[in-house]
Structures are given as structure tokens and as C-alpha cells.
Amino acid sequence: MKKALMIASVLLIAVISTACINNIAVQELNNKAAEFMQKGDYESAMNRLQASLDLDSTLYETHYNLGVAAINAGKYEKAIEALENGLKLKPDYVEFYYSLGVAQAELADEIIDSDDSDDNEHKPTQEELDKVKSLRIASNENLSKYLEKGPSSKDKETIEELILENNKFIENDDNLVKVEK
């Protein structure tokens, strides 16, 4: 009985020690990522944040920061993935909705811009049109949720403009020509 208690105690201490070491490592990785973000080195920040999530994927803040870093790095699909994962952990964190809406709109723009060419003969495929439209619709849903949930949206006007721009694309998806403001 004493032996079993001793083994259980050693295992408990090992588990607690590992958890503490992981928490310290996660904190260090997140701090380093913040430094990289301040310097504009979003790729390095993303690497640190992903390593942090590999150690502890339960921190919604790390998912959010990874999403923001990915948006700034132009990695919109990665941003959407990170933000959706974080949103599952903390659906009442309103900033997820804003950043997710922005990432979705930016990815839609990227798909459209990749179709721009000098020969003007390239027509987007139906699959591309469908993806752009669904991204714009999802973007509007997330931006609208942000406005609903965000008690003091300082950037309300900017968000409403993005929603209007999304609507122009949704309504004109047959030609996908950017409508100038």
C-alpha cells in the first residue's frame, strides 16, 4: 500500500512538473512571438505561436494571435483555420469575429487578384466564383456578429464599408469585377 501511494505521488509530481514546464515554455514562445509581431516578422511569430499551440492548444489567445499574425503575413487560409479553432474555445471573444471576417474577405480578394492577368482572357472558374461568394457571405456574417457583440465598435464605419464591399461582390459574382467605391 505504501509502495502504491509512493508511486502515485511520484507520478503526480511528474505530471505537475511537466505541466509547469509546458506552461513556462508556452509563455516564453508567446512572448517571443509578441516581439516578432512588434518587429513585423510575422512568419517567425507564426512559427512560435504554432509551437506554443503544439504544447497547449487550449489557449484561445494563442489561436487569436496566430490568426492575426497569419493575416499580417498574407496567409489567409492559415488565419481562418487558427481563428475558427480559437472561436470554438471562446465563442464570446468578439475579436475573433472581426479578424475572421477580415481574413475571409482578404482570401476572397486574393482569389480574385490571382485571376488578374495581362491577357484579360482568363475567366474565373465556377468553383472559384462559388468559393469567393461563400467567403464574402461568411465574412459578412462574422463582421455583423462583431458589430452585434462588440459594445463599442470604434471602427463601425470601416466594418460597415467592408460589408457593403462584400455585398457588391456577392451581387456581381457573375463577372467578379471589382466595384470601385
Q: Where would I find each of the regions flagged by the language model?
A:
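Canonical positions in the second alpha-helix
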Residues: 52, 85-86, 146
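Terminal, low-structured helical/coil segments at or just beyond the last alpha-helical repeat
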Residues: 117-181
